[in-house]
Structure formats: C-alpha cells, structure tokens
Amino acid sequence: MAIVKPFKGVRPPKNLVELVESRPYDVLNSEEARAEAGDNEKSLYHIIKPEINFEPGTSEYDPRVYESAAENFRKFQENGWLKQDDKEQYYIYAQTMNGKTQYGLVVGAYVNDYMTGVIKKHELTRRDKEEDRMKHVRVCNANIEPVFFAYPDNEVLNELLMRYAATSPEYDFIAPIDGFRHQFWVVSDDKDIATITAEFAKMPSLYIADGHHRSAAAALVGAEKAKQNPNHTGKEEYNYFMAVCFQASQLTILDYNRVVKDLNGLTSEQFLDALTKNFEVIDIDAFNVKLSGDEEGIPCYEKMAIDDAISQFGLDILKPAALHSFLLYLDGKWYGLFAKPGTYDDADPIGVLDVDISSRLILDEILGIKDLRSDKRIDFVGGLRGLGELKRRVDSGEMKMALALHPVSMQQIMDIADSGKIMPPKATWFEPKLRSGLIIHKLD
C-alpha cells in the first residue's frame, strides 16, 4: 500500500509566485531558459537551469553550475523569495487547459515505495541522466521540482479536492508560454491531512506519469542518505520525495508523432507499396464530416473534399480517431493507414500499442530505424503543436514524411506498469506540464 506524508513546503509569497515560477527544466534548452529568465533575478531558472548564471556555452554539467544552483537556492530563501511553511501539510495543484481542469495532490512520496515497486514505472532511465538529477538534489538538499504521478480514481479524495476547489486559492495565474491556468491551495486542516494519508494507504500502487529520471534520482539520493546516516530511523525527511498525484481519469495524454528524414532508399511509390503488407492504405482525397444532426438528433455526415474540410475545420480534423489507425503525410498528400488484423496482439499490453505497431512495422521493418532514442533520422513532435507542425517540417524539405498516431491511454500505461513491462520510447506526451517553483521539498 502507498505511503505518503505531508511536508513543510518551501514556496514563494503570493505576490512573487509569477516572478519565481517557471517551466520544468527538461522542456527547454539553456538558450531558451536564459531568454525567459531575462533580467528577472527571482526566476527559478537560476536554480533549475543554473548554467544561465554563466557565460553562454558553459556546460550544464560543469561542477560550478551545480554549486550555483545551491547558492541560488540559499539566496532565494535568504531574500524571502522562497519561504518554508511552519506546518507539515498537503497541497493541491490544479491545471486548466482548454476548459478542462485536473486536480493534483502534492505529497511526500515514500522512497521505499519506489524501491519495492509500489510506485510503478513504465519507462527505462539512463544512468547519466539519473546522475545529473542526483547531483542537483544533493547540492540543493531538496527536491526543487516535483514528479508527476497518477493514482486510481478515488471518490473520497475527489470530494475533498472539489471542496477546496470551491474556495479561494493561494495562487491563481495564467502561465506565459503555455497560456494555461494554474491554481494552488494549502491543506492545513488536520482532519483533511489524515483523510489524504489514509486514502493513499488503501492504494496498492501509484504510477509515474512523467518524471522517471527525477523519481529515480530522488529515491536514490534518499537511499544514499539513509545508508550514510548511522542514526537513521526511517522518519527523516529524505525518506520522501515530492510528487503531484492526479486521478488517472483526469489526465490528458496527447499524440506523440514522428517525422523521418528519408525513406531508407525507397521511392515514395515503393514505400507506399511496402506499407500494404501490414496496413490498408487510403489516399485521403475526401473526408466524412459529422454535422450536428437531423431533427430527430441522428448524426448526419457530409462528404467534403479534403482541402475544404481542412479549410473549414483545421488540419487536426485529420487526426487518427481510433486505435490502430495512423495518418501519413508524404509528398504533400495525406494517407490513412489502418493496421490489418494479425499485426498486433490484443492480449499483449505492449504489442497492442500503436507506438509499438508503427515502430515494428514501419520504422524498423521498412525504414530501418531500430533505436528511436539514438537514430538521427527520426524526430518527435508533441501533439500540442498539431498536425501543422508535421506538415511544415515535411514541406520545408527538412523531413521526408510524417506519421501521426492515436494517443496512448492512461489505462494502457497502468496496464503496462502493472505487468512490469516498459513502454516503447517516445510513447507519451502529457499536457499540461507541471510548473516549477510553486512548491519545493527540503530533505532535512
């Protein structure tokens, strides 16, 4: 069963939160962080992207860079830009994107739950990335940024969240860049704290949605500190790391699409012909558009030329609407691809995934792309950027073809994690991303 605890959060005063908060460290590069921070000395980028405190070109892995993160964390606290709460408490973090709100509980997750598999993962981690995050946690002696967890829907917790959502939040702002609304509440009532702890204790598992390297680093540093402490009791703060936990049904996973530089020596005609072995290939020259319905409420469809449909409804009307369907853009034309029966196994939580089908039968078998992490011929485009970005990169000549996929579901992720298997690379794109700087967890 999952163990969580409240903690004394370190966070900005209400009037400074929009100056401090930032995007997470791993969604932008050093130049972008430098530009976004500008002359704002209160920006969290000075802690999570500390290479911006040095001359451009300074390696983010330079020992001075890590020390700069620690120095700035101390400076932020000394200047009152970050203050630690007096009481151990939970927090609620809500994000609203396109009119849909998801509510997360900010908790201290138990390091041992990660080590024993109560906290379940679905991605492999790289040791070099783990070590980078471990160095950052060590020098700051804190989890500066949270990990993103999912948990099975829970009516008791949902009622508690909705009760707080009806009250005035501690923070409430529209973030730059993403344009989404972010709200934050403090849960200091002892009864509510006890309820949250008790409800999590009933859950057999928690699931890492996003932040596998941060989770691994936090857990490894916690275990490291326990080993180094001769008076270790198991109650120390380093036995926990900061996570924002959302109900699984509330989470939005967007499509994570592929663009490829070449056709592995094939002509376009040869490539399309090769696809017919495992897919039904449809040249999309017209589109059935669902209208509002007739007088009896029965849906009506109108067949429209593809250019007219795109002009009226936008490119995203072409997105794959069901599992095992794909959208190909090649030589200025759109094609629908539908996996034939027998090309996937519904009983296999990995083999049934569209990311696996496309990787096996298109990228590997036809295009010779065997390692999605390292092959320079392929790149990935998060669904928030839309099909327009796929079209742009192909039309520009940078890429030869684009492949759009139906998004993975949270249930599929949980099924894979429960089976102990690992998702294929570049399979999930969660949106909105957690903002950093709203809350920090110190390890002492």
Give, region by region, the residue ranges found by the protein language model.
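Surface-exposed, charge/polar-rich loops and edge strands
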Residues: 1-444
